[in-house]
Amino acid sequence: MELSISQSPRVRFSSLAPRFLAASHHHRPSVHLAGKFISLPRDVRFTSLSTSRMRSKFVSTNYRKISIRACSQVGAAESDDPVLDRIARFQNACWRFLRPHTIRGTALGSTALVTRALIENTHLIKWSLVLKALSGLLALICGNGYIVGINQIYDIGIDKVNKPYLPIAAGDLSVQSAWLLVIFFAIAGLLVVGFNFGPFITSLYSLGLFLGTIYSVPPLRMKRFPVAAFLIIATVRGFLLNFGVYHATRAALGLPFQWSAPVAFITSFVTLFALVIAITKDLPDVEGDRKFQISTLATKLGVRNIAFLGSGLLLVNYVSAISLAFYMPQVFRGSLMIPAHVILASGLIFQTWVLEKANYTKEAISGYYRFIWNLFYAEYLLFPFL
């Protein structure tokens, strides 16, 4: 440790290694400090004992000030409202519990279909429809939350291997709280639909909840069987969502249900797309599925084969969309539909190539699956303008 004393009333301590003046031919005073002798320059003198004490007092006073200030900062950090902190953590856990990427798909899909129905019937648009549309979106989010939530409750062991970041698997949300949330989502969704959309749409909504239940809950737990699992996901996310939202929107406009070519296209397109999502969603989970003896196409056929199968089915979708634009120019805007789907198909081919070059690592598989969801969002964003 070095003690430097100068003419100014400042005292400087350093924890660096001693850097003292080398011994010279001239005699210099020294000060004994903690068993060590520190050489001092010749012109430095302690004029009186009081000066030394004043300097010691200065150092001690400043040390106490710094110490008090540091302690007060620590105390302030520790005195943050624990209730607000718990609320923030619970909100974060609930948001992760809802699986945000599925919420985005549900919200975009319903918004796109409502927008398309309104574009086809602009003369029937009125402000009272906004509240009805928002209530429908709320019901869909509740249904989505119920389905993904109950799946997490029955997949805790698997998620600790495959998805340890999910709130129940991570210990951020208790099973009891999760049950309360899924029960709330189911009841709230059914009430909103029942009061706003009539018995037929309520029946479709109930069917979606039922399919989501048997997908995850024993003894049926249909997710154990690949074909049944794919059909359930494709039915709920593909057909029921698109048909139900479009039917409800036309009913709110006072119109009978009638298929239009664009709506038939998006329903078919998204149903096949949902099938691809159902196939590829197990790609990042192969390790946990094998450990818990869950039979999926990925565990049976291998990650590479399923990735190529998923990409191939999506390419069929894109080729069909481009063909429709050529075949029905009076229905679809070919100037948008053709180049947009060429770009999306090219992106899919490139992402599949990236996955192949990465040798199907877990990170590359996760990136590929996220890209598929981005393609899903992109189709709904395009749909109102096709």
Curated annotation (Swiss-Prot):
Seeds overexpressing HST accumulate increased levels of tocopherol. Keywords: Chloroplast, Membrane, Plastid, Transferase, Transit peptide, Transmembrane, Transmembrane helix. One of its GO terms (cellular component) is chloroplast membrane. Pfam families: UbiA (PF01040). It is a multi-pass membrane protein. It catalyses: all-trans-nonaprenyl diphosphate + homogentisate + H(+) = 2-methyl-6-(all-trans-nonaprenyl)benzene-1,4-diol + CO2 + diphosphate. Its EC number is 2.5.1.117. It is an enzyme of class 2 (transferase). Belongs to the UbiA prenyltransferase family. This is Homogentisate solanesyltransferase, chloroplastic. Inhibited by haloxydine (3,5-dichloro-2,6-difluoro-4-haloxypyridine). The gene is HST. The chain crosses the membrane at residues 130-150, 181-201, 204-220, 225-245, 259-279, 306-326, 335-355, 365-385. Involved in the synthesis of plastoquinone-9. Can use both homogentisic acid and 2,5-dihydroxyphenylacetic acid gamma-lactone as prenyl acceptors, and solanesyl diphosphate > farnesyl diphosphate > geranylgeranyl diphosphate >> phytyl diphosphate as prenyl donors. Do not catalyze the decardoxylation of homogentisate uncoupled from prenylation. InterPro entries: AtHST-like, UbiA_prenyltransferase, UbiA_sf. It is found in: Plastid, Chloroplast membrane.
